């Protein structure tokens, strides 16, 4: 039976895995692979999307199920906030800051990202003090630009220095082609990311900071007596989604990074270049549902099964069995 994988020859001539570096690689045994679910599904696996760029990955094995120009550099828009949050989570994990650490709202944060800006905001009051925990909720749930800037200034002293930290940290965790210029994702001609890097980043956050990742599934947050719902459209769909974020710029269109679990397996996707927020939600749902149905896990070898014999020269025996390791 000939099996077909969900990617084009121009993108990936053969199935790839996306590594988790520098932390432990969560790859399954080579004896476990994801294959098209049936001969019929082998043809259906030739999926397409209206997105200009797209990437779908199965998390446990790191298998790329679908890719469409995922290394093209695009404007990240609010998806840059994933990198901002990684730095905040890292600072919490290493003890540099605490969840109840208080930061003061500067005039820059208020004017650039707060109520006067007209953008996504948690409506932080000028010169008020806000805890790191509340700022995290503001950024993740409300996509708050003021929350990002307050955190950046509090941790690094200025947003410019924080952006330098973002770039250094991005390299440390395995991002290859992305450049950050601010904590919010507000337009900057030099600020670019790839979907490959965004999925790598999302995957890293999910595995390294499970206690903070849960905030991405929070449905709403109220600050300054203003109630706002989570902006991630995937949370409203019945597909098992529990994160991550969205973004929009005129040049890159509507984009999204989403993470969802189905039948005990996690899938992470990124889309960009969509025409409307409605189309973004529709295409995101479509690619997740396709991934759930088009592939199945296949155990090629049983645990402890002899796969082959290896010749031994000068030993007691002429050969030794090669067996599938215990899982």
Specify the residue positions occupied by each region the protein language model found:
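Bacterial N-terminal signal peptides that target proteins for export
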Residues: 5-28
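Juxtamembrane/membrane-water interface recognition
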Residues: 18-21, 36, 84, 151
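Bacterial N-terminal signal peptides
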Residues: 27-37
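Active-site-adjacent loops and short helices of periplasmic peptidoglycan-processing enzymes
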Residues: 42-199, 203-208
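Domain-terminus/edge residues, biased toward the C-terminal soluble/receptor-binding domains
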Residues: 175-179, 187-327
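Hydrophobic alpha-helical membrane context
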Residues: 36-37, 75, 93, 295
